[in-house]
């Protein structure tokens, strides 16, 4: 399940994409448009800045801006930045499945197929697909 933090991060990114023609967007403007507490958004944008997805500046002309074009962000990348792996089971969350039961696991193919569907769905959607 995707948390509120993950959903709000996606909304912040959509808002920044919709206003990408401006220099920097003040957090208070995003908070007002998205009807999300500015205090809560401070936590979200801090994580987005530290991950390199957006840039932030304080001061008179401060605010936030996308680091790339909206079509260069996938929804999957944004969500995984905030949530971590979207894999349904721990053994699929790593590059290498080191589960000692992997060879004999009767449910692994099911989880693997589900993981691929979720990954392909979210990574197949670009931020630019979500803007108005």
Predicted regions and their residues:
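Short amphipathic alpha-helical interface segments
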Residues: 9-21
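A short alpha-helical element within helix-turn-helix/winged-helix DNA-binding domains
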Residues: 25-34
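Alpha-helical residues within the helix-turn-helix
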Residues: 32, 49-50
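Key DNA-contact positions within bacterial/archaeal DNA-binding proteins
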Residues: 39
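Short, hydrophobic-biased segments on the C-terminal half of alpha helices
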Residues: 45-46
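Beta-hairpin "wing" of winged helix-turn-helix
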Residues: 52-66
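Non-DNA-binding regulatory cores of transcription-related proteins
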Residues: 67-132
């Amino acid at each position: 399940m995707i948390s509120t933090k993950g959903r709000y991060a996606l909304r912040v990114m959509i808002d920044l994409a919709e206003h990408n023609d401006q220099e920097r967007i003040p957090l208070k403007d995003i908070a007002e448009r998205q009807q999300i507490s500015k205090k809560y958004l401070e936590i979200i944008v801090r994580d987005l800045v530290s991950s390199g997805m957006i840039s932030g500046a304080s001061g008179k002309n401060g605010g936030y801006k996308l680091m790339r074009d909206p079509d260069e962000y996938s929804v999957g990348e944004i969500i995984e930045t905030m949530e971590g792996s979207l894999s349904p089971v721990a053994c699929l969350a790593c590059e290498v499945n080191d589960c000692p039961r992997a060879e004999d696991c009767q449910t692994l193919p099911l989880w693997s197929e589900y993981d691929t569907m979720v990954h392909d769905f979210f990574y197949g959607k670009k931020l630019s697909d979500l803007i108005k």
